[in-house]
């Protein structure tokens, strides 16, 4: 049955108008969330899944209440998104990496390395547009990831990070 909902999602629902559009956007989001509730491990109440979100087979994805995934995001199978998370468009959460240690073999012939390290985004986080989260990291509760950042390590709770690689800018509690 899950395969049927994947077919409906990728063949139809993902192409519907964005959730930001009045009336038709809400209906489109409702269809996408309807499919996600039958695909994901957990899909909370009042969630937003915007158009063209790619999540593979989605079987291990968890998304909490009042959270949203922006347009054109990539969310791999081993991702946990907690409550009240805002994910801007084109965020990529990476699950794979290329092997490159053997210099006698071209990198393109060294198999991609599937990681089973989960990525967790804590409650009340904001992930800026076009950010990249590398595998196996935790974004602490209340954190903000600046637009275009590349997160290569865990982010402490209530920390604003930015850059490539992302570095702490300041705490949300003041300077």
Mark where each language-model region is.
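Terminal amphipathic alpha-helical/low-complexity segments used for targeting or macromolecular assembly
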Residues: 1-45, 84, 98-103, 111, ...
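C-terminal/domain-terminus segments
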Residues: 136-169
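Flexible, glycine/small-residue-enriched loop-and-beta-strand segment within the central core
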Residues: 26, 53-63, 68-138, 164-165, ...
